[in-house]
Amino acid sequence: LFLVGNKKTAVNEKIKVDTLLSEIPLIYREDGSATRISMEKFMTDKGIKAKMKLQLTSNEAVKQAVIAGLGLSIMPLIGLKNELEKEDIQILPVKGLPIITNWRLIWLKGKKLSPIASAYLQFVTNEKERINVENFSWINSY
């Protein structure tokens, strides 16, 4: 997760992260969102008292609000590829970021998976390295 702003956002790189995040209202995801949980844990761990400007229910809504100049947010890089390439959004350099998170496949213990779900799980398990290289290697440049 990275701190992002629109292309017009100017941040003094010498400013401390706690000062920055305490003074600039942020755009949050909704309660229960894994992005929000990670974001709030980061701020709690750093002793940062952030101000919430907006709370939105999807990464797409947050992204569009950031592009429109409504504020900054801490967002997952995976959903920002096109906006970074078009320079609609920029990553703001902040000490302590990015926040590294992991994705997991989950299912109910003891539930019999459908043939399609079983095939999908097997495919992802067998092909995860190739999937990562083919689809997400661009992330390494950030």
Segments and roles (model prediction):
Residues 7, 77-79, 95-96, 103:
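Short secondary-structure boundary segments
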Residues 18-19, 63-64, 118:
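Alpha-helical segments flanking ligand/cofactor-binding loops in enzyme cores
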Residues 32-42, 46-48, 118, 122-142:
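Ligand-binding clefts/hinges and TM-proximal coupling segments of bilobed small-molecule sensing domains
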Residues 90-134:
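A late-sequence structural motif
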